[in-house]
């Protein structure tokens, strides 16, 4: 389980054994360069940006999808999960690189404006699972084994 360690999500810390905190403003994780095999730091502003870009690339390559059973379930009283994903997707956009050339996405405030005051909670959750692709795996054993 990965949880948003900012705001309300910070209360999860310590309650779910093995849960991984996600701090979107943190530095991005190093990745293995396919050419050299070395760890490199990608050119993203922060972890949230790194995960959104990498998740988008993964979806475009067909490596991730939402099953039809889940996509067709109701998200709330007016939208299916698929409709909510499509609604939130319009708010997640690339932003101009900063002076250091770091890749960015638009601010959370700009996202909320595009979503009529809503936060892109569903897409944030989908994006946060990318942390398991980036972060070394930790195995938690229960009991005395």
Residue map of PLM features:
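Outer-membrane beta-barrel transmembrane strand signature
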Residues: 97, 102, 106-113
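Residues in and immediately flanking transmembrane alpha helices
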Residues: 17, 134-137
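Acidic, Mg2+-coordinating catalytic module of metal-dependent nucleases/exonucleases
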Residues: 108-135
